[in-house]
Amino acid sequence: MGKTERKKELLELFEYEKIKGDVSYSSIMKKAGGNGKGFLDRYFALHRNYILYYKLGKSSLKPDDKQEPQGYINLMDCNPDDTKEIAPLMFQISHKHRTYIVKAKDESSMKQFLTLLIARIRSLEKIDIDKLGCTVVVLTKVKKFREVLTNPLILPDRVSPEMAEEWVKQMKNYNASFNLADPFIKQVEQISEFCRGEVKEYIDWFGGPEGPRLAMIRCEETVLSNWVEYINKTSSEITTYQDNRFFREDFKDIAVHLKNMTTFIDCYNDYMIHCRKYNNNKPNTKFLEEKQTFKEYIEKFIPKVASCNDVSLNQFYDRSLIQSSDGIVTINTSGIKKTLINQSNIISITSTTTTTTTTTTTTCSMPNMSNLIHSLDHTNLNIIDLNHSKSQQQLHPPPSPHHQHLHHQIVSNSKDFNISVSSNNFNDGNSEFPNLDINCDFDLTSASNLSSPILSSEVPSNVVDPIGSGQGGGGSGGGGVTAVTEEAINEKWHFDCNTSMIFKPPSEDGRNEGSNMSTSSITSKMSLSLNGGFDMKWVYQCGYFKSKNMGSISWNGKHWCWSHPRTSYKIKYIWDPTKQSFLNIPFKSRVGATGGGSVPSSQSTNNLQSSTSSMSSLSSSSTSTTKRSHPTTLYPDYQFKDNLLTPIIIEGRHQPSLTLIDSPLTIPNACLLTIAMTQYIQDALIHLSLGPKVLSSK
């Protein structure tokens, strides 16, 4: 009897330091000693298939770390029916060699210990120790399971359609391996002789929070919920998929996307049947109606792929009618630009010389810079350098050694306008050197000020602000309107038939260098300072007019739609062949929507491929979008007749500054509309903080 409960090798294994982190329950109770010694305090610990009892020192509540137990009770040799309470605060543990009598200190601890003890004995009764084998056999089996269910088990949280079937197959293998390993591991972990070293390490991981079962559950939840989200989203939006999609590439993308959704449905049901555990009931297959709908739309779009031709701009006009040797058609545009002059926009110019204290003050109104230039001419001064506070863009040739730099700073919030200039009569420091300070209070907070020449905002003909502020009459100035100036606009654009490119040639203004710069050159440079950076070229490729930094315009002969990858805002027109007109379709923004609402639908290729190309593509779109509110501009309709494009004046719509776009030869009417809308596109981009300088700074 003493031999069976005090084997030296086991006592060494049960040093308190080795088992204290692996104890199910522990308590100080009194054990009946042999040879009539009565009840003695012992520290009882329930450790896997053993009860260990330690001798305590005086006033000690726990054994020392290096202390071996006084003895142990192998629960695999105990009878659960005879292990029971025999008297108040007293119970017995029935072992095949001996009955242990234990007295608890309180009723609660006794019942808790006895409940755990009996449950452990009954669980151990079900284990066939011979089937498990020896320690070497157990270690070999654990290593085989570890080859499949590796530690750590890395599983994806997103699975692309191309990998969906492979993922389901892999999860089936994981589940099959887990179903074999789980009962074996649960038996091994109850046997203290087996559960040590690398076996214990693997078992602890297997049943822990990072183990295979919980890892597979987390993977299942994220992957399947992502599939369900895409299936439901596609089902709700499928009727709108052909809106603004008219090209072969569009229909190909839609067909591929719908096939991917049917793959998701098949793989989802396959997973639910073979990998989910149910109580004798197979799950009902889901999304069968959606799958049938997807198949019907696939059959609808596949013929369109075959019938669509590769879109070329040549199909929209007769190329043979262009007789120009270089294939370039010059397009003339004309109109009137109106400028507001506000009471607050008054400049005081003070000129002070270094040799005398003479002060000259000139007053002119802004933003009419010509008055300022005439004032400067009276003082025989020239503007040498011009810097904008935002762009820091130099707009002049390098100054000569006899010129001092002019400093120009615009701070829109404080409305300060400061300029310092120098004299062109500087002779070795002996002549008078006047310094000029200009202070101006004018409003630069409106994006239209930054997008219009000469620091001015256009005067709306009706009640709509050009950038969509929705305010009319007063413009963007800080004070009341005192005058409205008008300036004729005459610009030229070119259409290159060979490259299908629309472009605006560089302005000849501002190319004269030196001190004899004209008023027009200075104002032109100032205009470029505020509007510069836009690439004034549109190239038609694969159904789109594409610009370097102004977005793209889809055109298929019927629908004209401008979009930009960093905003959901769009400008849409539809061609009405009966009226020979382009009719504007007002943009409908969601309530509270901002520019970052979604990826533009015209970017259909990117949008659909985001769910088909790779595993990471099923995650949320990484495309950065602007968070500014959308413009509310109501754009005019345009009529096309005899190669002329003119706006149709409608009450409530904005009246454009370009009132005539004239082509001497027949070219695609969409080219003329693109020219007419370029300024509006620039205004919208600046309003959305997507102007070229903003983008380049980011």
UniProtKB/Swiss-Prot annotation:
Start and end residues of each stretch annotated as Disordered: 594-630
Gene Ontology BP term (one): adenylate cyclase-modulating G protein-coupled receptor signaling pathway
Main localization category: cytoplasm
Gene3D superfamilies: Pleckstrin-homology domain (PH domain)/Phosphotyrosine-binding domain (PTB)
UniProt cross-references to InterPro entries, sorted A to Z: PH-like_dom_sf (IPR011993), PH_domain (IPR001849), PI-Interact_SigTrans_Reg (IPR051707)
Molecular function GO labels: enzyme activator activity; phosphatidylinositol-3,4,5-trisphosphate binding; phosphatidylinositol-3,4-bisphosphate binding; phospholipid binding; protein kinase regulator activity
Protein name per the record: Protein CRAC
Source organism of this protein record: Dictyostelium discoideum
Lineage, top ranks: Eukaryota, Amoebozoa, Evosea, Eumycetozoa, Dictyostelia
Gene field: dagA
